[in-house]
């Protein structure tokens, strides 16, 4: 009769909770910087895609309207300006201020697309931090390519 019933041990001890929280904190500490780098790479890739798309669109418009289109790159103001043969500004595209733009040659800062699909050609290097891309416009075909360096 003097026997006491056993109590089922349910729940976690304080030590188990502390160890679990420590493991979670270490995991978050390792994963968070990788997520930050990943989002920066995605942002730069999106900017480069927009940069390339401006050239592609200007080429398509030159072919469909049968008039030359020119894309002028202003690396200082991070701005692309698209004009027609009469120097009429058709549209502009602002780029991120953190994106550095370099032309391989100074004359490449202006790329002219002809109605036949050809262009004056050009090559650009776009960088943000350690992430870099090379965008080239072929002179013969007018094709625009972007490659990560």
Predicted regions and their residues:
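Glycine-centered recognition micro-motifs in short, flexible terminal segments and loops
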Residues: 1-21
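N-terminal helix-rich module
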Residues: 1-8, 26, 30-64, 68-149
């Amino acid at each position: 009769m003097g026997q006491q019933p056993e109590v089922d041990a349910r729940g976690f001890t304080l030590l188990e909770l502390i160890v679990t929280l420590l493991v979670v904190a270490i995991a978050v500490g390792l994963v968070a910087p990788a997520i930050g780098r990943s989002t920066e790479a995605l942002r730069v890739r999106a900017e480069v895609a927009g940069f390339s798309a401006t050239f592609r669109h200007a080429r398509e418009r030159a072919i469909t309207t049968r008039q030359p289109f020119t894309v002028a790159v202003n690396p200082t103001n991070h701005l692309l300006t698209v004009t027609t043969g009469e120097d009429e500004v058709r549209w502009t595209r602002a780029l991120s201020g953190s994106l550095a733009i370099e032309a391989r040659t100074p004359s490449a800062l202006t790329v002219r697309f002809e109605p036949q699909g050809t262009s004056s050609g050009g090559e650009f290097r776009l960088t943000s931090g350690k992430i870099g891309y090379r965008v080239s416009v072929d002179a013969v075909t007018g094709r625009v390519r972007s490659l990560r360096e």
